[in-house]
């Protein structure tokens, strides 16, 4: 069963990555832009497959965050270079075509464009319990959003 789910996620990446890459990365200052690209129940009862692109202008970053508690995530770098760190692991820079995964409940402490001059984009594929959400919840500091 797990192999079928992994295969479905990889097929989604293969299908969605070229379409997501065809759209230019939005340039809106230093904020990452998240664009939903896929949301479909699976043939596994109670599970859904969702995908988003995350576009980073040069030097942009995402706030530290958590994802939906049930979500297993596979990320694929479409363009540029993405610096990522999940709590407890060393930070790493991923380049075009590279992937990483995040286990359910992981705390994503770093997610940013590794370049100050070039945009970057990733595709994140979520396998999660149907109805679980939101997909991403940013951390807060003293009840204020991270900046």
Describe the residue ranges of each PLM region.
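Ligand-binding loop in jelly-roll beta-barrel domains
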Residues: 83, 90-91, 104-133
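A short, N-terminal "cap"/entry segment at the start of jelly-roll beta-barrel domains
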Residues: 2-7, 14-50, 91-93, 100, ...
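Conserved hydrophobic/aromatic beta-strand scaffold that supports enzyme active sites
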Residues: 51-53, 74, 99-101, 124
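Extracellular/periplasmic catalytic domains that process cell-envelope and extracellular macromolecules
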Residues: 43-47, 68, 76, 93, ...
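Conserved short histidine dyad/triad with adjacent acidic residue
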Residues: 50-68, 90-91, 103-107
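Glycine- and acidic-residue-biased ligand/ion/polar-headgroup-sensing regions
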Residues: 70-88, 98
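Short, flexible surface segments
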Residues: 58, 79, 96-97, 104
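Short, solvent-exposed loop/turn elements at domain surfaces
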Residues: 62-65, 85, 133-136
């Amino acid at each position: 069963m797990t192999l079928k789910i992994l295969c479905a996620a990889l097929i989604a990446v293969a299908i969605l990555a070229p379409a997501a890459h065809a759209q230019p990365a939005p340039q809106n200052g230093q904020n990452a832009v998240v664009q939903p690209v896929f949301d479909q129940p699976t043939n596994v009862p109670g599970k859904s497959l969702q995908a988003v692109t995350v576009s980073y202008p040069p030097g942009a970053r995402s706030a530290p965050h958590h994802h939906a508690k049930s979500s297993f995530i596979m990320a694929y770098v479409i363009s540029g270079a993405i610096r990522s760190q999940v709590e407890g692991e060393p930070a790493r820079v991923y380049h075009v075509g590279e992937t990483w995964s995040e286990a359910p409940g992981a705390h994503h402490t770093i997610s940013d464009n590794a370049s100050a001059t070039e945009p970057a984009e990733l595709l994140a594929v979520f396998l999660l319990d149907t109805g679980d959400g939101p997909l991403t919840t940013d951390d807060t500091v003293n009840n204020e959003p991270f900046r």
